[in-house]
Every structure is written in structure tokens, then in C-alpha cells.
């Protein structure tokens, strides 16, 4: 590998670092060759079988409904997507599940509901109102780049949405994880009005990034369990 190739791999690795908790580079060599292909024809020839141009969301290791998942098709998970400037994501929310408050530093996010009913909340900046909308099947909303947003399934059935983002390296930052797990506690405590003991207790209960989704409100989980639905987060 020449200097140019080494540099390109370094840039790829740096660009994907922020989403490494969710997206792993499935084939670094193929990704490098795709991004360096001199022509579109050369690029296409890297994918000799027609099936090589297809991404199967349901075959991905992070695909789950318990509590749910965010499955991304981007240059990390699907090298064929490199160079198109987009990420497509399948959002799965199991009963009473949610995507915790988060933001994408490098992408605007278009989200459309496939089925069910999903409540969404979005805050663009200090001083802006909280925008709350309910997405029923066929309805879409937009989360501008770097806006804080969250989505919640308050029903007892699985809900699915599709997300299109205008970057193949969107980045995702979960607000609670950033505050309570990743920043120095001595900086966070004054900002949230906590004492050291309170802060440590909160940090221990923040869910891991995991598959991108977490179990939501306890009252919803209890309601669905009482109605006879199998809801694992209610234990």
C-alpha cells in the first residue's frame, strides 16, 4: 500500500471513530478501493455480483426489537454506499421503547414512519421551543443537523421508521452518556446542580449506547405487561 492509500485509511478511521460504538467497518480494504477507484466503471467492477449492491438491514448483527435498534447503511457498514454522501437507517422500536435524546453533529435527519405511532421531540438550540410531533404511518419530520431529538413508542406493538441523513459519516452523541459517563464529573456536577454522590448514582444507571434503542417509560411497560404483551423491560 502506497502513502496515498495509508493516508486514506487513516482518514477513514478518523472519520468513523465517533460512530464506532454502533458501526464497525466491515471491509476496510474494499472501502479504500471503492473510494480510490479512478472511474465509476472501475468502482462498479469492485462489485462483480448484482447482489453485492444490496444491503440487508435484517441480516445485520445489531438488528433487534428488544428493546429496538438503529441499523445504518453507510460507508462503514456497506462500502458500496461510499461517495454518495448519505446514510440510510432502519429504526426499530419495540413496545414502550425509545431512542434516547441524541444529536448528529454532521447530518440533517429526515425520518418517516412505516407503521404505528411514534412521538418525537426536537430542540434546535438555546431559546428554541421544543417541537413535538407524532409520526403515524406515512408521516415525516426533519431533525436539522446537531439538533437534539428523541423518539418514543408509547404503544405495545413494534414500530418501524426509516431515516435518511445527508452524510455517510453522521456521528451520534447520546446526551445522557456524554454528560454522565464521558465528561469529568467535576465539570458536570455544577452544570446540573448535583452533588458528587447524586452524580455517581446517575452515571451508574445511564443505559449503554448498545443497539441505539432503550426501554422507555415504566408506566408504559407496566401497562403493556398488564394487557398481556410480552415486554422484557417490565421485569
Per-region residue spans from a language model:
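A short, N-terminal "cap"/entry segment at the start of jelly-roll beta-barrel domains
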Residues: 11-89, 100, 202-235
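Conserved metal-binding segment of the jelly-roll/cupin
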Residues: 95-96, 134-156, 165-166
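Short, conserved secondary-structure segments in the cores of folded domains
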Residues: 89, 99-101, 109, 131
Amino acid at each position: 500500500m502506497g502513502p496515498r492509500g495509508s493516508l486514506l485509511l487513516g482518514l477513514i478511521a478518523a472519520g468513523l471513530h465517533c460512530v464506532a460504538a454502533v458501526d464497525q467497518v466491515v471491509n476496510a480494504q474494499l472501502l479504500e478501493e471503492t473510494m480510490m477507484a479512478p472511474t465509476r466503471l472501475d468502482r462498479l467492477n469492485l462489485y462483480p455480483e448484482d447482489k453485492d449492491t444490496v444491503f440487508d438491514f435484517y441480516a445485520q448483527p445489531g438488528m433487534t426489537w428488544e428493546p429496538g435498534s438503529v441499523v445504518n447503511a453507510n460507508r462503514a457498514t456497506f462500502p458500496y454506499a461510499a461517495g454518495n454522501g448519505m446514510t440510510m437507517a432502519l429504526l426499530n422500536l419495540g413496545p414502550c421503547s425509545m431512542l434516547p435524546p441524541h444529536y448528529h453533529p454532521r447530518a440533517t435527519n429526515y425520518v418517516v414512519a412505516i407503521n404505528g405511532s411514534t412521538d418525537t421531540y426536537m430542540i434546535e438550540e438555546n431559546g428554541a421551543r421544543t417541537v413535538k410531533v407524532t409520526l403515524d404511518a406515512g408521516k415525516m419530520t426533519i431533525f436539522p443537523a446537531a439538533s437534539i431529538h428523541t423518539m418514543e413508542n408509547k404503544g405495545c406493538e413494534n414500530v418501524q421508521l426509516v431515516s435518511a441523513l445527508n452524510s455517510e459519516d453522521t456521528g451520534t452523541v447520546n446526551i445522557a452518556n456524554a454528560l454522565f459517563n464521558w465528561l469529568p464529573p467535576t465539570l458536570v456536577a455544577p452544570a446540573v446542580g448535583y452533588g458528587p454522590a447524586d452524580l455517581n448514582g446517575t452515571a451508574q444507571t445511564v443505559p449503554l449506547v448498545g443497539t441505539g434503542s432503550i426501554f422507555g417509560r415504566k408506566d408504559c411497560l407496566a401497562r403493556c405487561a398488564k394487557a398481556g404483551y410480552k415486554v422484557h423491560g417490565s421485569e
